[in-house]
């Protein structure tokens, strides 16, 4: 499903300003860019765009209340200064499975004073010598890197903010049902359009037949009608004989 269509699904009967949690996982971005998401989502606190083939976050709008951003399994290699400019209150950032190769790529994140948790699993940068020490030194505001703090203590399984968002959000099953209903509606609209086209074609064919009859001389037309009546009478006689 395209990202714009998925946004339409998520917005059904709601205004963008009323949305606090938005999940766009596994939909298709537009040439590796975010599309359809606007600054009207001003109260958004949780945004997930996992596996949407993103190359860049350049089109991310200003989201002043965003706290948690999931961007794992994309192809982002840089441009993180956008996050510092447009998500100033970010606390959790997941960039796992992206194309982050160098520590200095993370430098723009220094401007996110509330950033507590950063995930970089399956990024090449994690293979560098002294990776963890370097990241904690670069980003002193961090508490957890890849699920562990600087003393190798594991992060809690869940954080209260995320739980609150999940409780306030719709259940996964409801989302799936809504998505199926939405797709069915789109299919019905397409079928209606096709049906209208077919009806139009049938009407045109009927009009052409009427025109053909009008073109036939009156004598010929009367002759045809008489022949048709004669055929019907013959059929009736055969039935009586039986």
Curated annotation (Swiss-Prot):
Composition-biased stretches (Acidic residues): 148-217, 227-242
Disordered as annotated region, ranges: 148-242
InterPro entries: AN32, Leu-rich_rpt, LRR_dom_sf, U2A'_phosphoprotein32A_C
Subcellular locations according to the entry: Nucleus
LRR repeats: from-to residues: 18-38, 43-64, 65-87, 89-110
Stated family: Belongs to the ANP32 family.
Domain notes: Histone binding is mediated by the concave surface of the LRR region.
Protein name: Acidic leucine-rich nuclear phosphoprotein 32 family member B
The organism of origin for this protein: Xenopus tropicalis
Encoding gene, per UniProt annotation: anp32b
């Amino acid at each position: 499903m395209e990202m714009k269509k998925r946004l339409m699904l998520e917005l059904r009967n709601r205004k963008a300003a009323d949305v606090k949690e938005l999940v766009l996982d596994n939909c298709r971005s537009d040439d590796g860019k975010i599309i359809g998401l606007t600054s009207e989502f001003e109260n958004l606190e949780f945004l997930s765009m996992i596996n949407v083939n993103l190359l860049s976050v350049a089109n991310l709008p200003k989201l002043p209340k965003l706290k948690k951003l999931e961007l794992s399994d994309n192809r982002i290699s840089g441009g993180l200064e956008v996050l510092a400019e447009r998500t100033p209150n970010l606390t959790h950032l997941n960039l796992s499975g992206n194309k982050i190769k160098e520590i200095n790529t993370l430098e723009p994140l220094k401007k996110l004073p509330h950033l507590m948790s950063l995930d970089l699993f399956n990024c090449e940068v994690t293979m560098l010598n002294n990776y963890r020490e370097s990241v904690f030194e670069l980003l002193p505001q961090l508490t957890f890197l890849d699920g562990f703090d600087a003393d190798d203590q594991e992060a809690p399984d869940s954080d209260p903010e995320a739980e609150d968002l999940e409780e306030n959000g719709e259940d996964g099953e409801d989302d799936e049902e809504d998505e199926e209903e939405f797709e069915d509606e789109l299919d019905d609209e397409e079928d209606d359009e096709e049906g209208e086209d077919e009806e139009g074609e049938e009407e045109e064919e009927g009009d052409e037949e009427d025109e053909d009859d009008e073109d036939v001389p009156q004598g010929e037309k009367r002759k045809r009608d008489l022949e048709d009546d004669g055929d019907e009478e013959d059929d009736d006689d055969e039935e009586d004989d039986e």
